[in-house]
């Protein structure tokens, strides 16, 4: 039986409430004088808003390092002072969302918004990398439901596609919404989405990045902990 619009709205509302619950918890992790990596996406945006409330209400003294144009605008509108990656010596904590999280390994797939290259640079540079997710994002095996995005230099898109086809995958260039043609990232590149067997996240992450023309892929094998929003509480998963 087809799901009704009311049922779809209820599922979306439940997911949104879980995201807000975990965003509020994550904002409490930030301490005075920290440099904070600000992730991108719907859950990260909620975190940025909650963190902005603390900056305004508690006069929390921090700097944020945005990972996309979207997170930069959200942080600015929320009252969070910003600093660029080359201006800060180190990042104390990076807090970001995920499209899919493996429960056993805490490896992730990110990049549904096409920001994974800048996210990975900031997240991996941080002393602590914390991921926010609702329980619907948890999976037993990474990549079963979510394609891995590859940010690809336009000059090399055809050779990257051919290489992925040689690997018996089914790659697809991500199309834009509201415009004709492909999605173009903040870095001026294209996105190729590919479903691929991921037995070892770190090995697959490295292998995809070794394809000439691939700038970065959406597998994140390094994560310190995941805050999971459930109907009862926020669970903390650690390696």
UniProtKB/Swiss-Prot annotation:
Annotated gene: rpiA
Pfam family, one: Rib_5-P_isom_A
Lineage per the UniProt record: Archaea, Methanobacteriati, Methanobacteriota, Methanomada group, Methanococci
Entry's Gene Ontology BP terms: D-ribose metabolic process; pentose-phosphate shunt, non-oxidative branch
Annotated positions binding substrate: 40-43, 96-99, 110-113, 137
Family: Belongs to the ribose 5-phosphate isomerase family.
Keyword Isomerase recorded: yes
Subunit structure: Homodimer.
Annotated function: Catalyzes the reversible conversion of ribose-5-phosphate to ribulose 5-phosphate.
Domain of life: Archaea
The protein's name in its UniProt record: Ribose-5-phosphate isomerase A
Pathway: Carbohydrate degradation; pentose phosphate pathway; D-ribose 5-phosphate from D-ribulose 5-phosphate (non-oxidative stage): step 1/1
